[in-house]
Amino acid sequence: MATTADFRNGMCLEIEGQYYFIVEFLHVKPGKGPAFVRTKLKNVATGRILDKTWNSGVKVEEVRIERRPYQYLYQDEMGYNFMHPETFEQITIPGASIDGVQFLKDGDMVEAMVHATSETVLTCELPPHVKLRVTYTEPGLKGDTATNTLKPATVETGAEVRVPLFIQEGELIEVDTRDGSYIGRVKE
């Protein structure tokens, strides 16, 4: 059991038989009345975000999870398939429970969150930054560098990323998987 004082981002809770990850939390101490904690929780099964307010000091059921490395293999109608690099065990995770799934490409390593006691896979986490090749983008106009203008670019996974005007087709770029933003060019 954990209390609201133990809350941290990424913590897994069991609420009414469902598993939730804490996305955000904020301790609020109003001038009048008792303190409370506002949280944004992500349902592991559906991927939906739930806003929940807790009275300060309330006890909640914390779920112990283990992080294990897995390699992405392929996608089918059941979800995304991964393999453990040492045991060659294969697992399938539904796409709704994976953040940044549009940046996942064959062979990428992810961290799977596994329930410590029941050994069920809850979700997986992509690395915060990935390197992707630009497959399509409009050509930038020469000399148009006065402003910080961005243009759409399609990367090798099919996702669309906003990039600066100087980025051309075939270039390797680094993308933040959490918000899909362009980080920079990668030297080859």
Curated annotation (Swiss-Prot):
Involved in peptide bond synthesis. Stimulates efficient translation and peptide-bond synthesis on native or reconstituted 70S ribosomes in vitro. Probably functions indirectly by altering the affinity of the ribosome for aminoacyl-tRNA, thus increasing their reactivity as acceptors for peptidyl transferase. It is found in: Cytoplasm. Gene3D superfamilies: 2.30.30.30, Nucleic acid-binding proteins (2.40.50.140). It comes from Porphyromonas gingivalis (strain ATCC BAA-308 / W83). SUPFAM superfamilies: Nucleic acid-binding proteins (SSF50249), Translation proteins SH3-like domain (SSF50104). Signal peptide: none annotated. NCBIfam families: efp, PRK00529.1. The keyword Cell wall biogenesis/degradation does not apply. This is Elongation factor P 1. The gene is efp1. GO terms for biological process: peptide biosynthetic process.
